[in-house]
């Protein structure tokens, strides 16, 4: 069976988007530490209509990113790796290990400290960077390994979304939350009545986002719950869910995530930056992402296979699973996003961002080198195009 063109496009976009994301991060760091650094940071902190520009990026544009994540998850549930329960078990169990172990490592260092709210930071995986790094290895990578990493990262992001909704939502306003639930219920009814026109769902999503913004539950959650009421149908190219997913890939990869990186990596690296890396928070983040992620993913997979709960695909080797588990430690955008919700102190946020970037680069290099050693021979075109 041929791999769908959309899946190929997805991998290609993630690879190119990862490069753009890296460039945006480097540019942001360079400008922030230049002579115009304070003006640059001031731009993102400028108030427009009662909120900062950074706030609009994090609560507005990132909702579109989460909508795409939700649509990806919907596709996996209805027609992808998560559509078959036994096939879905391996990435689900892997993702659980990749969330629980890093969070426990951070908690070990920070329980009882002002940093304990940051335990959700090392739980996340940046799907754009992780898949982008894997794609650098070209046709040496078995398709099942790419699919495993994609499913793992999507489930990981879902776990991060639940973490945000449960632990980082403040001062719940029941009336606004009920309003958002009411809008969602109307959209669900439209879905069940086979209303296959996109604009009612997008319009309802905007209203729902407004209610969520004022409810105390983080507004970006709107993107995910909206995705699951947009009709998927049979998953054919005419499905409005598939069409929207296709339309969103390039804007998210090449506009929204780079803008997020520009807004949230404008960090002034002063003489005390190395001291911030010695804090228990930074140590917890670094060890959580670089050690906890691969340990948790690999350990949980090994236990599940040993118990006979699930099995790894025939064309995968354990050494390759370990390499992908290392790439799971690339937290970057998702980890930074949770950092902004976990802390209010600017110094702590800046220190966390530096730790996240250092951890993500380390995890990427380890994963890339590990896979380069374990993936020896390029696969033929026929093998890379067939499942």
Curated annotation (Swiss-Prot):
| Recorded topology in the membrane | Multi-pass membrane protein
Q: Which GO terms describe its biological process?
A: regulation of pH
What UniProt keywords are attached to this protein's entry?
A: Antiport, Cell inner membrane, Cell membrane, Ion transport, Membrane, Sodium, Sodium transport, Transmembrane, Transmembrane helix, Transport
As its record notes, the protein acts as a catalyst of:
Na(+)(in) + 2 H(+)(out) = Na(+)(out) + 2 H(+)(in)
Name of the protein this chain belongs to: Na(+)/H(+) antiporter NhaA
Answer whether the UniProt record assigns the keyword Glycosyltransferase to this protein. Answer: no
Any one cellular component term from GO for this entry?
A: plasma membrane
**Organism for this UniProt entry:** Cytophaga hutchinsonii (strain ATCC 33406 / DSM 1761 / CIP 103989 / NBRC 15051 / NCIMB 9469 / D465)
Protein family: Belongs to the NhaA Na(+)/H(+) (TC 2.A.33) antiporter family.
Location comes to: Cell inner membrane
Q: What is its main location?
A: membrane
Offer one Pfam family short name for this entry: Na_H_antiport_1
GO function terms (MF aspect): sodium:proton antiporter activity
Tell whether Repeat is among the UniProt keywords.
no
Q: Which residues cross the membrane?
A: 16-36, 53-73, 89-109, 118-138, 147-167, 171-191, 197-217, 220-240, 251-271, 283-303, 321-341, 354-374
Q: What does this protein do?
A: Na(+)/H(+) antiporter that extrudes sodium in exchange for external protons.
Per UniProt, what is the name of the gene that codes for the protein in this document? nhaA
